[in-house]
Amino acid sequence: MMEIFSLTGKIILVTGASSGIGRAVAQQCAAAGATCILTARNQDRLQQTLASLEGDGHSVIVADLSTVEGVQELVSALPKVNGIVCCAGVVETQMLKFTDDSDLQKLFNTNAFSAIRLIREAVQQKRLQKESSIVMISSISGVRCGYLGGSLYGATKGALEGFTKATALELAPQKIRVNTITPGMIETPLLDGSAIDAEQLEADKMRYPLKRYGKAEEVGYTAVYMLSDATKWMTGTSLLMDGGYTLN
């Protein structure tokens, strides 16, 4: 039974792999037997992720996916892969009236356009094996709920959700699946470096029926499931994992 969840023999590209969810996804994919290709902008942190992976044959490609050129160079350097997990992203909280076009460009280039361009280039350059799996890391802020100052961030994640559904239809003839993982708040370095104090964080956790935030490795487990052959009949789906938050 457990073999159906194995990633042995699969090559998986993980973006945003230098920390947080991306690092955890790479670690769990490697633990499940995958050969991982890690990409992000920070080489030192990528090497730290690489050193933490089980198994051999993993590699690193430093790339800035917020630019067209960075995406093209990355895809040109890739072998054919069996899966892509798009984890690259930033979180910024800012009221809409205080934003300008540079804020729009930064968030959309990093959170949405990087993933969209990556999949476009991978398809155009024929870097996806038949029956590959593409997984987008979205957020409940994109489709399920909003928060003050989250208009741009939510818009970027909503864009990924819409892209996933249409692209799933487009790639279905090649048996390539496209799905999203839609988490609530996850404990990552991004959260640790936020301006929210410990008391506020504890109060916010109590709004979750399971009384805690998610862990990055839990997103990693879910990514492994969606990359595995256990989900060969799942595409265009948004898999919600939010500790029950949106039940409220």
Language-model features, listed with the residues they occupy:
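Conserved glycine-rich cofactor-binding loop
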Residues: 18-19
